[in-house]
Amino acid sequence: MDSLPKSRLLRFVERAVVLARRAVARYATRYSRKRFTLRQHVVLLCLKGKKTTTYRDLVDELIEMPRIRDALDLDSIPAPSTLCKAFDRLEMAVWRVLLNVSLADLPVNGVTGIDASEFERAHVSTHYTKRTNLTIQQLKTTLLVDTATNAVLDIHVTTTRKHDTQIAPQVVKRNAASITVLTGDKGYDDQKLRRLARDHDIRPLIKHREFTSLHKAWNARLDNDLYNRRNMNETVNAAIKQKFGAFVRSRRWWKQFRELVIKCVVHNVDRALAISCEEVDCSRF
C-alpha cells in the first residue's frame, strides 16, 4: 500500500491536517475525554464539505479508507452524532482563523475582486421552510477573492437583503492589509467606499453608474486589463457551487454561515494543491 501514489483526497487530508495544527488547539479543554482531537474534528468536517456528503455517509466511507484514517491518526471512527456535536461547538471564529491560515502558502498579490452571490437555504426541506416562515430562502454571500490565485480571502454572509455598498466597507476594513487593488462592478459604486479604500492605501477600481457623460468618461479611463480580473470572483463563485453545492444543509442560520466558510476553506486547500502541482510534476497523480 505504501508504494501506491497518493490520491488527491489523501493529499487534501494531509494538507488540512497541517492547517488544523496551526489553527486550533489539540483539545478544547483539559477536561476533554481525549478520544478525538479538535484537529481531527476540523479535518473530518472539511472532508465532509469536500465530498458534499452527510455525517452518516462520511463515517461509512471512512471504514474503507485506511490511508485517510492513518493520515488523521484515527484509532477509531467517530459516530455521526459526535461530528454533528463538534460542528455545533466549533465557533465561527475557529473557521475564520482556518480560512486565514489556508492563505499562508498561497502567492496572493493583493489584486482582489469583490462580488456577491446566493446560496439556497431551502435545500433540505421545503416543508420546513414554510413551517418556520422562512421568507428569505437564499443567503447573500459576498466573497473577496485574490485574482492571481483564485483564493478566497474573506467571506461575508447575511440573511437580509443588504445592499452591496453596505457590506463592502466591512470586508475592506477587515482585510485592508491584504488588499492593494479593489475591483468591483457598478453595484459597489459608492463614494464612501472609494474614500475608505483610499484611506487604507487601496486603489479602488469600481465602475461608475453612468448617469452623466462625466461618469462615462471616468469608466472609459479605467484600466480594463486590471478591472476585468474581477471576473475571477465570478469564476470562484461558480466553481464553489459546482464542486461543493449551491446550497447549505444546516437548518440554523449560524450553522449555515459556518458551512459556507468551510466551503471556502476547502476551496483554498484545493487551490494550494493545484498550484503546488503546477510547480512540481504531478502527472503521475
Predicted segments with their positions:
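Charged alpha-helix within mobile-element recombinases
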Residues: 229-240, 257-269
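DNA-recognition alpha helix
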Residues: 56-72
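Major-groove recognition helix of helix-turn-helix-like DNA-binding domains
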Residues: 70-90
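Basic, short loop/linker segments at the boundary and entry of helix-turn-helix/winged-helix-like folds
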Residues: 2-50
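Helix-centered, glycine/charged polyanion-binding patches within enzymatic domains
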Residues: 181, 186-252
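Polybasic low-complexity intrinsically disordered regions
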Residues: 33, 39, 50-53, 83-200, ...
